[in-house]
């Protein structure tokens, strides 16, 4: 799984060198942000049901046509699958926060996602709207500390940009 640490070591090893000072500074910065990432992961993990429900509700509110016949949310089973997918991505955001790198999202969430959505007639814009809602809904300090919020929003932005 890719993280700042594994990426740094892999790059140094591929070049047949020791990690440079800037490599080590990058790793040190990553480690210093670890407490904030873990706080964000803990808050997301303990509130994931509400986060997923609110994100899904926002998605269907903005894209109500998805409940029309022939669309991604035409029946309760398909609606439940949309909420399940949002939950899956939130879990990957959680893993990304714990790992400190985008590996979980890259390996398990983003690779091929656009192709799958297009093939299954699932609008990625609706999922993106759910993640944008989650990012924009975040309230500091009610939900988490400022630095934890930065880490959480950074992970969400990475996902949003990758699916766009």
Swiss-Prot record:
* Annotated (2R,3E)-phycoerythrobilin 2 binding sites: 47, 137, 139, 142
Q: Domain of life of the organism in this record? A: Eukaryota
Keyword terms: Antenna complex, Bile pigment, Chloroplast, Chromophore, Electron transport, Membrane, Photosynthesis, Phycobilisome, Plastid, Thylakoid, Transport
A GO-annotated cellular component:
chloroplast thylakoid membrane
Provide the protein's localization.
Plastid, Chloroplast thylakoid membrane
- Report how it sits in the membrane: Peripheral membrane protein
Q: What are the disulfide bonds?
A: none
The processes (GO biological process) annotated in the record are:
photosynthesis
Changes after translation: Contains two covalently linked phycoerythrobilin chromophores. In PubMed:8876649 the authors refer to the bilins as phycoerythrobilins. In the PDB entries, the bilins are named as phycocyanobilins although the modeled compounds correspond to phycoerythrobilins.
A Pfam family per the record: Phycobilisome
Record: residues binding (2R,3E)-phycoerythrobilin 1: 81-82, 84, 88
Q: How does it assemble?
A: Heterododecamer of 6 alpha and 6 beta chains. The basic functional unit of phycobiliproteins is a ring-shaped hexamer formed from two back-to-back trimers contacting via the alpha chain subunits. The trimers are composed of alpha/beta subunit heterodimers arranged around a three-fold axis of symmetry. The phycoerythrins also contain a gamma subunit which is located in the center of the hexamer.
| Family classification | Belongs to the phycobiliprotein family.
Extra facts: The light-harvesting antenna system in red algae and cyanobacteria is formed of phycobilisomes. These are composed of the phycobiliproteins phycoerythrin (CPE), phycocyanin (CPC) and allophycocyanin (APC). Cyanobacteria also contain phycoerythrocyanin (PCC). The phycobiliproteins all share the same subunit composition and organization with variations in the covalently bound open-chain tetrapyrrole chromophores.
Role noted for this protein: Light-harvesting photosynthetic tetrapyrrole chromophore-protein from the phycobiliprotein complex.
Recorded protein name is: R-phycoerythrin alpha chain
Give the source lineage, highest ranks first.
Answer: Eukaryota, Rhodophyta, Florideophyceae, Rhodymeniophycidae, Ceramiales
